[in-house]
Amino acid sequence: MKRAVVVFSGGQDSTTCLVQALQQYDEVHCVTFDYGQRHRAEIDVARELALKLGARAHKVLDVTLLNELAVSSLTRDSIPVPDYEPEADGIPNTFVPGRNILFLTLAAIYAYQVKAEAVITGVCETDFSGYPDCRDEFVKALNHAVSLGMAKHIRFETPLMWIDKAETWALADYYGKLDLVRNETLTCYNGIKGDGCGHCAACNLRANGLNHYLADKPTVMAAMKQKTGLK
């Protein structure tokens, strides 16, 4: 039996990954992390979606220690989430240091226990957000370290790594879940479901990708299929 664990926030990217994983694996587990995040409403959204889509199990892990150690606008109400600045340089204040290091490591430990062969994460380098822990080289390096530390190869899969946001919408549509991802996921840094606040970087990236996809579905769908190998 093929098993996988999805790092699942209930947002656009991880929900699209879950939808695809359910087609590719016999048994899919979801892991969601409570780190005292500003957009904590995502945890309830993740619960609802994991149940609705048919995940075998859904674990919510308490990692609130991360909140104490990692200062970010997503872990401190006193630090405002900035409006979208497409030309901004450097690492944005929404970056949570160590988040993906911790999430992927804990997901791999869970995968070890349930005998899953893969951990799936929705990180993406194409629409680079300025987060160093979304880079392909980081994921590959951590995957190697985790496999060495467990004496077991658990594969880290990044199905969205080389597709952009418009193509991510196309992927959801390919599996017949465009409306679900659009209306029932939570991507917004301010914790608003669906189209979100419309001002933060996450909302703008999501909206721009959707508009691009809806404006030229055939071209974007073809590009997504070419990059992912889907027929």
Curated annotation (Swiss-Prot):
Cofactors required: Zn(2+)
HAMAP family associated with the record: QueC (MF_01633)
Any GO molecular function: ATP binding
Ligand binding (Zn(2+)): 188, 197, 200, 203
InterPro entries, A to Z: QueC (IPR018317), Rossmann-like_a/b/a_fold (IPR014729)
Gene Ontology biological process terms in this record: queuosine biosynthetic process
Enzyme class: ligase
Protein name listed in UniProt: 7-cyano-7-deazaguanine synthase
Family: Belongs to the QueC family.
Matches recorded under SUPFAM superfamilies: Adenine nucleotide alpha hydrolases-like (SSF52402)
Function per UniProt: Catalyzes the ATP-dependent conversion of 7-carboxy-7-deazaguanine (CDG) to 7-cyano-7-deazaguanine (preQ(0)).
